Structure formats: C-alpha cells, structure tokens
C-alpha cells in the first residue's frame, strides 16, 4: 500500500495564465529566481510563485531581503517534497503516495500552499487503516494539521478501531498518555465491551514499564460497573495491576458493591455505571396488536431511520405504564394472561437494563392495576389509581427503589382510571381519566413534600390530606390520552371522551393542549391530523413524536406524527412507519452501548 500513487488535480487553477507560465517554464525562458533546497536547485518565475503561494507573495512583494535576490536558500524542507509542490504550482496536478506524502505536506505547509495541504489530508484519510494509523497520526501531529476536520475524522477511525489498534506495537509506542485519556473519556468507545477496554489499557501499560505511574489516573476512566461480575473476578482481580494500583482495587470494590445491590442500581448513578453512548435511541416496548397481546419485545428507531427489533428476553406483560430512572426502564402493571386464558390486571413490575439487554422482575405492586398512571420523583416510583376488571381504585402507592418495596401513600381524591401522569418540577400531575360519572377535565398535582406520616399512609381508608391539589382544568375532557413534559410545560395529546357511561359510547378528542405551571393556564394548540388513543409519545430532536395507537376511524396505526411546539405544527411521514400496528405501546429514549446495537444490526 505504501507505494500506491494517487493523482490530484486543482479545480481552481487558472488554466490560461498557468498555461503561459508553463510554456515559459518548459522552454526555460524568463526564469528569474533559483531556489536552493538541500543540494538541488529549482528555477522558477517569481510572479508565478507569488500568485500561487502566500509565502512567496510576501517574500517578493514586502520589504524583505529576498525580494531582489535571484538565488534563495530554503531550509526546513526537502528537495523531494518541494519538487512536487513546484510541479503543482505550474501544472495544477500532484501525485501522492505514502512514501512521499510526508515530504510533500511538509513543503506545502512551508510555502503555505493550502490546496496541496488539503489534498494531502484527503489522501491520508482515504489511506488510513490499522497498519498505517500510527504513521498518519504522527505525521499530522508533526505538522499540527487540522484542515477540513481531518483530526476529527482520524479520531473517529481511532475510536471505531480502538481495541484492535491497541494490539499493535507501533500504535502502543506512539499513543501518548494524554491521548489515551481523551479516548477513554469518549462515549464513542461504546462499541467495545468495557472489559476489552481494560485489557487494551493493560497492553498500553505493559508496553513500557515507565507508564505504570499513570495507572491510578487511567483506571478512573474505565467503567467497571459495565462489566459482568465474572469479568471482574476472572480478568481484573487476577491482573498484576490489581496488586499494584490502589485506585484499581477501589474501583473494583465499587463495582462489586454495584453488582450486589441489584435493586439500587438505578440510583447508583456514577461515571463507572454510565453507558458509553453519544445519542439515545427512540425505543418502543410493544403492547397490543389489535386485541392480541404481544410480549414486551423492543423496537429501536435507528438511523438511517429504519426500525430494528431487539432480540433478547421478553416479559409476558402488556404494560400500561413505563418509568425511567437513570436509563433503567420499569414496566408496570397493565394486563397479563391468566390461567383461564383471559386478560387480567397485573401487579407485576419488570426492570429492563440496556447495558446487558436483560430483564429483572421487581417486587409486585400491592394491588393489580391497569389503566393507571405513574411518575418518578427522587428514589420513588408512584402508581396512581387505576382498575381491575371488577374494581376502580383511588389508592396511590410508591415503589422505593432502595429496598424493592411498595407502600401506600395519600390516595387520589376520587376513583379513576384511563388518566395520564407526568412529573414536572418534582410534582406529579394527573390529568383526565374516567370517574364514576364521566370523562374528566380534572388536573390534580401530587406534592411529595406534603406527604403524611408513615402511620397515616398505612391506613388505606384515610381521608385525603393536602398532598393532592387541584389545578386549572383542561379545556377538553379526555381519557386514554398521552401527556409529556417539555421545556417546563405539559403537553396533552389525543384520547377519547366517554359520552354515555353505561354503554361506553365515546368520541375522539384530537385536540392538543399545553399547560403553563407558572400561570396555571391551559392553551389549545393545533389538533392532530388523525386523532388517536393508546398511542406512545416521546421527544426527539426538539419535536414531540406520537406513535401508533387506535385511530378514530377504528384502525390500529403504525404511523408516526411529529409536533413542533415552537411552530405549533403537525407533520406526517417524517419517520418510517413501525413494522407493525400497535396499541397500548410504551415509548422512551434510551442509551444503548454500541456492542448491543451491533448485535441488533446483525440480527436485522
């Protein structure tokens, strides 16, 4: 590869002027300057050099001693490099190879011929591979080149190939401590399991015994909580650096504590447990296809805007609610198939960990609930009201993540189901829903700072305390709608309005409303093009996405609508349709490590 030659041609070279100078040059006419480099002499035209190079223009037009000289000695570049640069100035073309690019880049930088510098950068980026990465890295460092983002592109290659590069002696020799630290701190390394990054660091340290003094500092950029317990025990604790580094022993102890306290992991938010991920993925936990329940398989909306299905464990639940705590997903309640083959309200709670693509069943809620609402405040997940087939609730309970237990708190003011809940400013807002009489416009907010005592909370029949407070009602009564907080406001989308409670006759409510907590006012916004209920909602790229659901024409949807809050406009077909028509889906944005996504890519 080193001998491969590639030609580059200038697109801005003035052909008419250059042709004239080229003819004079070839005939040896009117040459008025000789440039001496090493033991070689190059004759040229001052005027041509001045038009092509800022370096020569200043030399020949400013008050410099070389202006009137006919022989000029240039130092700091090679004759080989300058001969190619001089050819470019006359002919507008240049040939580059790995054997010559170093000297040509040196000469181009010297005489400030930026176009040739760009050609050299393009050539190097096209040629970069594992075998010559260290050489290219050294070359760019030698000349401090960063034209057209060449360093960023080189770093992208390095991050994408970090582990295999760290097995190469030439790369290990050249990679500095500072560069290694910057790479280990970069979330784009997520395509490699953390244990592989640790082994790569070991290779760098072993390459030169003098590097061991950096061990404690480097180790702090390895995220041991992302490893498996087996990897920590078998590959980290057995290494010579475990005995050498006090910081490594501390990090391992932290990781082992993290592994042991399974239920508390969402609250142990520290650098060593955070996924290396630059951008979250819109994630759909599948609910219903028509009237058939689907296990909670996972769909990912991935660029270039296609849907991937994430293979892995499934949970036998059609969840009604989703809660996110530090990139862990909790799916709560909803419906599950009973032994009689019928759907029943569920008390089950499952937690999904995208780090390992794994599920864990948590403590059940105190009572089965479907069509209820949840919200996360601090270390608690609140579950509000809801129903079973035979009973409607007003009870409210909360899940303590630290001890994997549920306890009752101050109940909602009335029995209700089909409502929606969202947390804003550390308060849980509940909107709409169905009461014993009709669909509701009610908005009620739960303030945990006003909760009663433990003794009060244990009495399920207690009277309502001042924990719940009514706010201004929505403009439209609705149930089975969706609500999301965005930029300090609450947005409500779709749903239905029950007209006759006895027959459950209903009509669609396609309207959109926004709530401003500072003024306690609701404002009507542009209605959805196609009203729906049972849909999912999330925010992506400053737009609110509405996915799937049951449309008012009676058909289940696989489409995605997007709402721009700034312009108050709806758009359709901005994103590809989901691979199936879904109702009751739960949607969120999750960070996944790239090694999980790579496996998804292979399966799709």
UniProtKB/Swiss-Prot annotation:
**Primary location group:** nucleus
What are the residue boundaries of the BTB domain, all occurrences included?
31-98
Highest taxon, organism lineage: Eukaryota
Which residue intervals correspond to the Kelch repeats?
328-379, 381-426, 428-473, 489-542, 544-590
Pfam families from the UniProt entry: BACK, BTB, Kelch_1, Kelch_6
Q: Which GO terms describe its molecular function?
A: ubiquitin-like ligase-substrate adaptor activity
- Annotated ranges, domain BACK: 133-237
Q: A Gene Ontology CC term for this entry? A: Cul3-RING ubiquitin ligase complex
- Mutating residue 552 to A leads to what result? Decreased interaction with RBBP8 and increased DNA-end resection and homologous recombination frequency following DNA double-strand breaks compared to the wild-type protein. No significant change in subcellular location
List locations, semicolon-separated: Nucleus
Instruction: Name its pathway.
Output: Protein modification; protein ubiquitination
PROSITE patterns named in the record: BTB (PS50097)
GO annotations under biological process? negative regulation of double-strand break repair via homologous recombination; nuclear protein quality control by the ubiquitin-proteasome system; protein ubiquitination; ubiquitin-dependent protein catabolic process
Keywords noted in UniProt: Intellectual disability, Kelch repeat, Nucleus, Repeat, Ubl conjugation pathway
Q: How does it assemble?
A: Homodimer. Dimerization does not affect PPP2R5B-binding, but is required for its proteasomal degradation. Interacts with CUL3. Directly interacts with PPP2R5B; this interaction leads to PPP2R5B proteasomal degradation. Interacts with RBBP8/CtIP; this interaction leads to RBBP8 proteasomal degradation. Interacts with PACMP micropeptide; interaction prevents ubiquitination and degradation of RBBP8/CtIP.
Disease tied to this entry: Intellectual developmental disorder, X-linked 103: A form of intellectual disability, a disorder characterized by significantly below average general intellectual functioning associated with impairments in adaptive behavior and manifested during the developmental period. Intellectual deficiency is the only primary symptom of non-syndromic X-linked forms, while syndromic forms present with associated physical, neurological and/or psychiatric manifestations.
Purpose of the protein: Substrate-specific adapter for CUL3 E3 ubiquitin-protein ligase complex. Acts as an adapter for CUL3 to target the serine/threonine-protein phosphatase 2A (PP2A) subunit PPP2R5B for ubiquitination and subsequent proteasomal degradation, thus promoting exchange with other regulatory subunits. Acts as an adapter for CUL3 to target the DNA-end resection factor RBBP8/CtIP for ubiquitination and subsequent proteasomal degradation.
Q: What is this protein called?
A: Kelch-like protein 15
The record lists the lineage as: Eukaryota, Metazoa, Chordata, Craniata, Vertebrata
Q: Which gene encodes it?
A: KLHL15
């Amino acid at each position: 590869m080193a001998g491969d030659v590639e030609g580059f041609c200038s697109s801005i070279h003035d052909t008419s002027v250059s042709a004239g100078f080229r003819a004079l040059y070839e005939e040896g006419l009117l040459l008025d300057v000789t440039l001496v480099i090493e033991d070689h002499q190059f004759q040229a035209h001052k005027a041509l050099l001045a038009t092509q190079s800022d370096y020569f223009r200043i030399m020949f037009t400013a008050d410099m001693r070389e202006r009137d000289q006919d022989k000029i000695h240039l130092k700091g570049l090679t004759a080989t490099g300058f001969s190619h640069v001089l050819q470019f100035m006359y002919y507008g073309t240049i040939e580059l190879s790995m054997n010559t690019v170093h000297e040509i880049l040196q000469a181009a930088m010297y005489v400030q011929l930026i176009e040739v510098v760009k050609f050299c950068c393009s050539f190097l980026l096209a040629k970069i591979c594992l075998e010559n990465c260290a050489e290219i890295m050294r070359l760019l460092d030698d000349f401090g080149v960063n034209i057209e983002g060449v360093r960023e592109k080189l770093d992208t290659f390095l991050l994408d190939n970090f582990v295999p590069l760290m097995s190469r002696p030439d790369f290990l020799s050249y990679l500095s401590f500072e560069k290694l630290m910057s790479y280990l701190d970069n979330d784009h390394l997520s395509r490699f399991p953390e244990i592989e990054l640790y082994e790569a660091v070991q290779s760098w340290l072993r390459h030169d015994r003098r590097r061991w003094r950096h061990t404690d500092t480097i180790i702090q950029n390895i995220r041991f909580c992302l490893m498996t317990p087996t990897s920590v025990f078998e590959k980290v604790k057995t290494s010579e650096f475990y005995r050498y580094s006090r910081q490594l022993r501390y990090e391992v102890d932290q990781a082992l504590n993290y592994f042991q306290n399974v239920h508390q992991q969402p609250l142990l938010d520290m650098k060593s447990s955070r996924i290396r991920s630059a951008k979250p993925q819109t994630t759909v936990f599948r609910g219903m296809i028509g009237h058939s329940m689907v296990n909670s398989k996972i769909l990912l909306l991935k660029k270039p805007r296609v849907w991937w299905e994430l293979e892995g464990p499934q949970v036998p639940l059609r969840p009604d609610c989703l809660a996110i705590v530090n990139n862990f997903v909790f799916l709560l309640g909803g419906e599950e198939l009973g032994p009689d083959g019928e759907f029943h309200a569920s008390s089950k709670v499952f937690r999904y960990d995208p780090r390992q693509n794994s599920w864990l069943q948590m403590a059940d809620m105190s009572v089965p609930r479907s069509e209820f609402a949840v919200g996360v405040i601090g270390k608690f997940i609140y579950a509000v009201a809801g129903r079973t087939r035979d009973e409607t609730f007003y009870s409210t309970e909360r899940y303590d993540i630290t001890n994997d237990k549920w306890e009752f708190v101050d109940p909602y003011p009335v029995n209700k189901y089909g409502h929606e809940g969202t947390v804003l400013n550390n308060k849980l807002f509940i909107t709409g829903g169905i009461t014993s009489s009709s669909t509701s416009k009610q908005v009620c907010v739960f303030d945990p700072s006003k909760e009663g005592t433990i003794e009060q909370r244990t009495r399920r029949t207690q009277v309502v305390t001042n924990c719940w407070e009514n706010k201004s009602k929505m403009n439209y009564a609705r149930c089975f709608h969706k609500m999301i907080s965005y930029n300090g406001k609450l947005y409500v989308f779709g749903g239905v309005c029950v007209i006759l409670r006895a027959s459950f006759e209903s009509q669609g409510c396609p309207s959109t409303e926004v709530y401003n907590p500072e003024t306690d006012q609701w404002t009507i916004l542009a209605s959805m093009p196609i009203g729906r209920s049972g849909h999912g909602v999330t925010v992506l790229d400053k737009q609110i996405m509405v996915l799937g659901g049951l449309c008012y024409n009676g058909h289940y949807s696989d489409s995605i609508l997007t709402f721009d809050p700034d312009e108050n406009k709806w758009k359709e077909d901005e994103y590809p349709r989901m691979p199936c028509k879904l109702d009751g889906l739960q949607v969120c944005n999750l960070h996944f490590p790239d090694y999980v996504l790579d496996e998804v890519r292979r399966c799709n």
